[in-house]
UniProtKB/Swiss-Prot annotation:
Pathway: Protein modification; protein ubiquitination. It comes from the Eukaryota. The keyword Nucleotide-binding applies. It comes from Triticum aestivum (Wheat). Its EC number is 2.3.2.23. Keywords: ATP-binding, Nucleotide-binding, Transferase, Ubl conjugation pathway. Residues 4-150 form the UBC core domain. GO terms for biological process: DNA repair; proteasome-mediated ubiquitin-dependent protein catabolic process; protein polyubiquitination. This is Ubiquitin-conjugating enzyme E2 2. Catalyzes the covalent attachment of ubiquitin to other proteins.
Amino acid sequence: MSTPARKRLMRDFKRLQQDPPAGISGAPHDNNITLWNAVIFGPDDTPWDGGTFKLTLQFTEDYPNKPPTVRFVSRMFHPNIYADGSICLDILQNQWSPIYDVAAILTSIQSLLCDPNPNSPANSEAARMYSENKREYNRKVREVVEQSWTAD
């Protein structure tokens, strides 16, 4: 990996340790700074409350000029999360900017949990349910939250 990307990832990690956003944690693998594990805790007073959701972030030597590949490892039910865990979020695609760091990425994903974009669905069933039957959508989200407690 190129030195600028490595330096930036070390800086991102240091910032995340020193000033972690609420409900978010993340760290690189022991021997690989380009592969990170992260956890997002479901925001309080939302259907996601109490959930512990695992993600991976894979960076390339083009970071921070190109976004990482981010995927949920935890099973999710959300309009903007594909079955394979990949996330439909503008800052991870066409709205990416080098000013975003790991903390900003994870915070944006945490915000997306509670504020999905049903007009850009990755999961059409979840998007339809979110728009047409919020009670049933919230029930499915609670199932995912409960599964997050026992998942590896």
